[in-house]
């Protein structure tokens, strides 16, 4: 696989409001293991959409892995205005999404709901698969994108769920 889209729950969805929460280290350890597998299979591009939570933690892991693996990181934001109203701490995280190998904005500003459909279609057409932290038992707005991914032909979907995190937690405590 050449390009992998990374999406998942936000920190708000997960009830994580502190980066020092043990859940963050479990999630990042799981991300690292999965990303290394993708990279060793030849992954060339990791693509983000600029969301906080799972995506941001995956971005941090990906940037660390760039020291040992040769691959590119890109962020394709839905709008140029994405994150402009975030607090100072989250602005720093937003800046991190912009300090990657490739940055693009799908639209200048929000005008209508159809832009989200076009944006999602663009992401699916320009990546070969996705790594998504999503559990069908804990639905969020991600549900619709995951359904689109699964319906796309020749598109690989790798779901990370709470069971995977439990396995990582147990390994950490062995």
Curated annotation (Swiss-Prot):
Q: Which InterPro entries match?
A: YspA
What Pfam families does the database record attribute to this sequence? YpsA
Query: According to the UniProt record, which cysteines are disulfide-bonded?
Result: none
Q: Which domain of life is it from?
A: Bacteria
Can you tell me which family this protein belongs to? Belongs to the UPF0398 family.
* Name the UniProt record assigns to this protein: UPF0398 protein llmg_0513
């Amino acid at each position: 696989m050449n390009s992998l889209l990374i999406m998942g729950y936000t920190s708000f969805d997960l009830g994580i409001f502190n980066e020092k929460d043990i859940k963050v280290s479990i999630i990042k350890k799981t991300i690292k293991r999965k990303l290394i597998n993708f990279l060793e299979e030849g992954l060339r591009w990791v693509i983000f959409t600029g969301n906080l939570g799972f995506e941001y933690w995956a971005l941090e892991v990906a940037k660390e892995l760039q020291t040992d693996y040769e691959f590119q990181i890109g962020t394709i934001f839905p709008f140029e205005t994405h994150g402009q109203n975030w607090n100072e701490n989250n602005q720093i995280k937003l800046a991190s999404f912009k300090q990657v190998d490739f940055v693009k904005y799908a639209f200048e500003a929000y005008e209508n709901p159809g832009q989200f459909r076009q944006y999602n279609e663009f992401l699916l057409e320009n990546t070969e698969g996705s790594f998504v932290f999503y559990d069908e038992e804990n639905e969020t707005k991600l549900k619709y994108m995951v359904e689109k991914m699964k319906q796309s032909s020749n598109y690989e979907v790798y779901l990370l769920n709470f069971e995977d995190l439990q396995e990582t937690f147990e390994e950490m405590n062995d």
